[in-house]
Design a protein with these regions (language model features):
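Active-site environment of divalent metal-dependent phosphoester hydrolases
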Residues: 57, 126-127, 159-166
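Structural signature of FAD isoalloxazine-binding scaffolds in flavoprotein oxidoreductases
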Residues: 61-78
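Histidine-centered catalytic micro-motifs
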Residues: 44-61, 157
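Glycine- and Gly-Pro-enriched alpha-helical subdomains that act as flexible
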Residues: 83-127, 133-137
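Conserved small/polar residues in nucleotide/adenosyl-binding loops
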Residues: 175-180
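Charged helix-capping and loop-helix junction motifs
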Residues: 134-140, 167-170
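Divalent metal-coordination and catalytic microenvironments
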Residues: 8, 53, 82, 118, ...
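Generic N-terminal segment detector
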Residues: 1-36, 148
Length: 180
């Protein structure tokens, strides 16, 4: 079987939506050929939650590992891509991804186990501005992934928890502690 590397990273730029209150994506020219410098040089700054990112354990648990401490092997290798835009095209933008969805995916796999990495596509395009309308994962869905031995779940939305969640619905042990 031919293997390929698929880059799922969304494009980032000054129009990249950011979580309310987070600093925006900024590109600043720090040196310029036009101003007599030997080269154009830019500085880029943005929130750690901008674009594709991983929440390291230290995000919620001070004194634990940061993103640099996570093994690269966790993020590279075989994975299953679940395209909910095809599987559930009528789902509302803010509808939770439920256990039934994972059961339907497993049924399509003819008894094969889920791989250790799962990516979930929930929308057809990125909104031009921040939107709290996105498909988060239900706690039961996350527990099912845990039970199946899934070590990494990637989503194309800002969080696996709903934007208006006052507490994390998904088990914290899964979303943050299983990464190291």
């Amino acid at each position: 079987m031919k293997q390929s590397l698929i880059d799922i990273t969304p494009k980032m730029g000054v129009r990249t939506p950011v979580y309310p209150g987070d600093p925006p994506f900024v590109v600043r020219l720090t040196a310029s050929v036009a101003a007599g410098d030997p080269a154009d040089v830019s500085a880029v700054s943005f929130s750690a939650h901008c674009g594709a990112h991983v929440d390291a354990p230290a995000h919620l648990f001070p004194g634990t590992g940061d993103a640099a401490s996570l093994p690269l092997e966790r993020f590279v290798g075989p994975c299953l891509v679940i395209d909910l835009t095809e599987l559930e095209p009528e789902a509302a933008p803010s509808e939770l991804v439920r256990l039934q969805t994972i059961a339907a995916v497993k049924a399509l796999m003819d008894g094969k186990a889920l791989p250790s990495r799962v990516l979930i596509k929930t929308r057809r395009s990125q909104p031009p501005v921040w939107s709290s309308d996105f498909r988060a994962l239900s706690p039961e869905c996350v527990e099912a992934f845990l039970a199946e031995g899934v070590e990494l779940v990637g989503v194309d939305v800002p969080s696996i928890d709903p934007a208006d969640s006052e507490e994390l619905l998904a088990p914290v042990s899964y979303t943050h502690l299983t990464l190291p």
